[in-house]
């Protein structure tokens, strides 16, 4: 008896991708966007198959992602933002609702929503994760979207 293994790959990147980008903390988020674009392009996705949608902030992502997924125009959505902890509970509310909302959109629609939203304690951590010491989480989210499109095509 042989165990069957099913997994996504990057052999033939196909599909149409929406980058959902937050305007808040744009000094960080623009680097996430550039990382995601670079990754999609390096895997063969044409610029004609990428659309960038700007939303005010991460709290607004679930509704925007729901509309994008419901349109039927996209094979995956890559959410890119940065929620930086401050001195009030605001961070917890925004980060939690964004995370839960995006997961609900993905489950309800069957469209992968890759999570490239930084939830960090400081501006320094955000900068590290947007292209310096800790890599580029926008690039990683784009890779996740590519792999999920491939995987779902095999299931």
UniProtKB/Swiss-Prot annotation:
Protein name: 6,7-dimethyl-8-ribityllumazine synthase
The protein's annotated pathway: Cofactor biosynthesis; riboflavin biosynthesis; riboflavin from 2-hydroxy-3-oxobutyl phosphate and 5-amino-6-(D-ribitylamino)uracil: step 1/2
Ligand binding ((2S)-2-hydroxy-3-oxobutyl phosphate): 87-88, 129
Leader peptide range in chain numbering: none
Stretches assigned to coiled coil: none
E.C. number: 2.5.1.78
Ligand binding (5-amino-6-(D-ribitylamino)uracil): 24, 58-60, 82-84, 115
Catalytic residue list: 90
Superkingdom of the organism of origin: Bacteria
Family: Belongs to the DMRL synthase family.
Keywords for the protein's UniProt record, in alphabetical order: Riboflavin biosynthesis, Transferase
Species lineage: Bacteria, Pseudomonadati, Pseudomonadota, Gammaproteobacteria, Cellvibrionales
Positions of transmembrane segments: none
Pfam families per UniProt: DMRL_synthase (PF00885)
Assigned GO CC terms: cytosol; riboflavin synthase complex
Enzyme class: transferase
CDD domains tied to this protein: Lumazine_synthase-I
GO BP term, example: riboflavin biosynthetic process
Entry function: Catalyzes the formation of 6,7-dimethyl-8-ribityllumazine by condensation of 5-amino-6-(D-ribitylamino)uracil with 3,4-dihydroxy-2-butanone 4-phosphate. This is the penultimate step in the biosynthesis of riboflavin.
Catalytic activity of the protein: (2S)-2-hydroxy-3-oxobutyl phosphate + 5-amino-6-(D-ribitylamino)uracil = 6,7-dimethyl-8-(1-D-ribityl)lumazine + phosphate + 2 H2O + H(+)
A GO molecular-function annotation: 6,7-dimethyl-8-ribityllumazine synthase activity
Record's subunit section: Forms an icosahedral capsid composed of 60 subunits, arranged as a dodecamer of pentamers.
SUPFAM superfamilies (UniProt xref): Lumazine synthase
